[in-house]
Amino acid sequence: MAITRNRRLIKRFLAQIEKQIRPLDYKKWEKIDPSLKIKLQPAGHILGSAYVECQLQGPRSKSKGKKRDTRIVFSGDLGATYSPLLAAPRSPYRSDVLVLESTYGERLHQGRRDRRKSLARVINRAVENRGVVLIPAFSIGRTQELLYEIEELLHREKIEDIEVIVDSPLAAKFTAIYRRLKKYWDREAKRKLRKGRHPLAFDQLHQTDTTQTHRYSTGTRGCRGEGLACRSDQGSAGHQ
């Protein structure tokens, strides 16, 4: 927490927050008080992210005798339409007032197909040259999306002589949480599971789950920081 480094206070604050948290399902109205109800919708940013629809009941109309309501939508980051693992965010049916995070709103991003091609090109070159690909990545969201796309590439092109190392204890913890929450994955990811594939737990994947292991790994690679490393297996003869 940014407000203090006092471990005792942090523990107390977190305990209080935990008492106040109420998990809600997506797409169901929840009454907060007689004049307000809310509904969560998938935001497609990270697993579990949501935007909030708030319906405020106003005063009764004098002409029609009906109560007028106002729909307000709040959202933080919104994900792309075809992000790996995540259901695509859908626009709300109605919004009278929209409050939206827009840090990268004016930028055009590569489509998923182009990103896949770029990733495949870099990893295949590393396999051919017996090299290493280092990918800095956020511990939550981006790491899991990359693992999903890398597993697809290894499966499609039958690449076996490669190690994929997630060199971040925090990312390893978030990846384990993603695996536990499979029911919130999108249909494409669930189809892979039914076929016996494991997009976040494939054979070539290795994760550092302690700080000590992370320090050893960065020392042996001669680099600092956290992220993913795709390393060609020097003991193999080549991919099929």
Predicted regions located by residue number:
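Acidic/His-rich, metal-assisted hydrolase cores and their charged scaffolds
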Residues: 1-71, 75-240
